[in-house]
């Protein structure tokens, strides 16, 4: 069997990626989230496939078809809630995965990092078009508000919006194409994941110390397969608690009302995992400025390798940058909270302060802290 897995073209590929892969001996549980994201993606594709068998992408029947899935299809409620809450688990793992990358300096692996940013954008696009499909109030108005942002693009904005809508408002054509996008994007994500792994295995994994670990590697199997398995079991446990006890805790009650173009909900807001970006968007009074800030809030991740001023790889021995990092995380949570609040004082002011702080920490304070730490440690 050993010879077989080392010689067979297909098994050789799996062997070099998951079995005989040399891995650093000291990677912590923060490195588990990559495999957890893979499991989340598999759960989403499988549950999504079964949902697509019963869903109809027509404005008159979309809402009813989701109700039909929950009421009449065998374990349809379970599949639907696994898919909805699976998306939340996906984003929790994504944010932790990116946060780990920032903390331990994984952004120095340029190709892997940049493919990761593209993956983040693609996943966000998938989640957005997916949220429109149940055709509830928040689905409809969320789609209307977010697609309308493209009208801020000078000269071609309005034409672009109508082209995406397939008409003069969010309607049947929009729903049908969003369903098509939602179906195809996870497979594009899967392809990108393989590219992400390809680039990662070119350089090898980073590790908590930030030092070169080539002299101290261990095989991925059995050490990290068993470790990943524990992570997967914990993830599934949390997901099942969510699905079976609190299936609607992360959703919006407005989405249980069928879409009505004549009745606007009091507070239009996206799913919780977009709230931080939504808060940044709302904190700028100008439409185009808001859209640019929204895109930059994610695209700023690409600037991390450029803004890195420290001679050390990881934040583990950098107390000043470490403090800034945790302030940044706290600020991100504040933005998430603000995104779900109505547009009124004091929320708007808090949102504006947090948005400025979000960009200031990344662009100004962290590079400065890196330079100060270099000076203190005499690392010129």
Swiss-Prot record:
The chain crosses the membrane at residues 33-53, 77-98, 113-133, 178-198, 226-246, 288-308, 320-340, 347-367. Keywords: Electron transport, Heme, Iron, Membrane, Metal-binding, Mitochondrion, Mitochondrion inner membrane, Respiratory chain, Transmembrane, Transmembrane helix, Transport, Ubiquinone. Heme b b566 binds at residues 97, 196. One of its GO terms (biological process) is mitochondrial electron transport, ubiquinol to cytochrome c. It is found in: Mitochondrion inner membrane. GO terms for cellular component: mitochondrial inner membrane; respiratory chain complex III. Its cofactor is heme b. It comes from the Eukaryota. SUPFAM superfamilies: a domain/subunit of cytochrome bc1 complex (Ubiquinol-cytochrome c reductase), Transmembrane di-heme cytochromes. Heme b b562 binds at residues 83, 182. Pfam families: Cytochrom_B_C, Cytochrome_B. The keyword Protein biosynthesis does not apply. Binds 2 heme b groups non-covalently. The keyword Plastid does not apply. PANTHER family: CYTOCHROME B. Belongs to the cytochrome b family. Heme 1 (or BL or b562) is low-potential and absorbs at about 562 nm, and heme 2 (or BH or b566) is high-potential and absorbs at about 566 nm. Component of the ubiquinol-cytochrome c reductase complex (complex III or cytochrome b-c1 complex) that is part of the mitochondrial respiratory chain. The b-c1 complex mediates electron transfer from ubiquinol to cytochrome c. Contributes to the generation of a proton gradient across the mitochondrial membrane that is then used for ATP synthesis. This is Cytochrome b. It comes from Thomasomys gracilis (Slender oldfield mouse).
